[in-house]
Design a protein with these regions (language model features):
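Phosphate-binding loop of NTP-binding sites
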Residues: 7-10, 85-129
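N-terminal leader/targeting and accessory segments in enzymes
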Residues: 1-87
């Protein structure tokens, strides 16, 4: 998938790469395959930015990060890497949440009964579980 398509709806402040084919998305260099977009996520014990050089050496096509690394490379700087990773992942999988319909049942009494009745009606109409 083209990087530009993956970045649809992602707010970024700096981008040093344009047309690149991305073959996957990864945030762990131990699982990175050549052609992947590497997301450098800040963490509690370690910071994914420490692994940018390793990711590029392993063949990452681009890096999604919160601050530009010192080394030159194909990166996209975003204000929140976790939010950007969520948006990029949604784009990668074709935004499946956009095709979902959610129902909610609220109230004090009768929620369980109502949900069982709704389930039975929807299964009868849609023919699926």
């Amino acid at each position: 998938m083209q990087l530009e398509k993956l970045l649809d709806g992602v707010e970024y402040t700096e981008k040093t790469v344009r047309e690149v084919e991305i073959s996957g998305i990864c945030y762990d260099t131990r699982e990175l395959m050549p052609g992947c977009l590497f997301a450098a996520l800040p963490g509690y014990k370690t910071d994914g930015h420490k692994f940018i050089s390793q990711a590029l050496a392993l063949g990452a096509s681009a890096v999604l990060c919160e601050h530009a690394p010192e080394e030159a490379g194909p990166w996209i700087v975003v204000p929140d890497a976790r939010a950007a990773l969520a948006a990029v992942s949604a784009n990668w999988f074709g935004r499946p949440a956009d095709r979902l319909t959610a129902l909610a049942v609220t109230g004090t009494n009768g929620k369980t009964t109502t949900t069982y009745l709704l389930k039975a009606m929807l299964e009868g109409v849609l023919g699926a579980k």
